[in-house]
Amino acid sequence: MENFTPVLRFIASSDLHANREHPSRVANFRKGLDLMYKYAESCDYKNLDAVIINGDFADGGRDEQMQDVKDAFDECLRPDTKWILTMASHEFFCEGGEAAALEKFGRIFGVPCDNHNIINGFHFISVTTTNGCRFNDEKRAWIKAELDKAVADNPFKPVFFFQHPHIQGTVYGNVYWGEDEITDILMNYPQIIDFSGHSHAPVNDPRSIHQQHFTSVGTGSFKYFELDEFDKIYGTVPPNEPEAAQFVLVEADEKGRVLIRPYDVLTESFFGYEWLVETPWEPDTFTYTDNRYNTSVKPYFADDAKIEVKVEGNDATVEFTQAKIDEDRVNDYKVTVRRKSDNAIVRQLCFWSRYYVKNMPETANCKIESLPAGEYTLNVTAKGFWNNKSTNSLTADFAV
């Protein structure tokens, strides 16, 4: 970005789920570290100052899972890179629960589970949840005290805050995977840029940044994708997808501006857009608000878009050219099947565009099962991330 010179750079990630039965997760994490060092070396500012894993780094909280993460830090990080960890529900899955997880964490990592670090003059506050993904009175008091210290140092500078669950009412994924027990504290500190995980929501979803009282950012997953919509034909977890490997790279300059860039380890590339927080301490300047739902930008099917329906028995499979959009990506599609004889709707199905995959396929498809014999008209509409329905649709006739 022009006229932006970093004085701080860090990785914010979540949900590594280290598990020796699934070695690709830690392998992809190690690969991501190497890629970010190479990226840093290509820049004028060459440091990678910190790496954060924001909870659920150990799939079942077992000793060897925590040790694999510690080994990754020891073997992959350079001496001038600080690592920061929080724990949450999956670390507590071990035998002995939360108490055992706390003991293991201290023994293996040698640091407290709640931390306040200052890196290059910027405050990093990280808190481990309790009782799963909750915050008791002791945690709340600690959070407030540490935030007070950070803001007393400089109220006109971002404060980077880390906890595993999303804050309800903020980033994508918060509906099912959010908590509200510290909202009343955080909203008094607009300087906060809050990083969270838990949901496995894609980092390239533009709803993974949100601003209202403060700035919130989702940090992705190294396990599977999960999405925060409940009308899809296969539930919230898209089937037959490779394990995710995503995080965000965060940079700050001497003015306190913060640049956030979603990254995909599997394709070794950034997603091609970035989020700039100009003045984190001033909510009146926030741009990533719910006003984005008022967009006039809508998906559309190109003139040469194709649609085909193949019938096998009483099942029909539709495949079509993906819609286009001038900003972001297409979120999902709705397929409506009407009986030709009376135009009555007999099926409605919704499914994702696979926008969370860096290299989106050029076509999309879905199967409509168990249709009675007859003639039908099928219609496909597209939708963006902001409930912005496509300006046109694709239509095909078929018979079973």
Predicted regions: what they are:
Residues 316-329:
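Conserved aromatic anchor
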Residues 62-154, 178-188, 204-241, 245-252:
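Extended active-site neighborhood of metal-dependent phosphoesterases/phosphodiesterases
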Residues 207-303:
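Binuclear metal-dependent phosphoesterase catalytic core
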Residues 12-14, 49-56, 82-89, 160-164, ...:
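Active-site neighborhood of phospho(di)ester-bond hydrolases with catalytic His/Asp-centered motifs
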Residues 21-27, 150-199, 203-209:
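Active-site-proximal segments of metal-dependent phosphoesterases and phosphodiesterases across multiple
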Residues 385-400:
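Extracellular fibronectin type III
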Residues 1-64:
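N-terminal active-site segment of His-dependent metallophosphoesterases
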Residues 368-388:
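Beta-strand-rich modules
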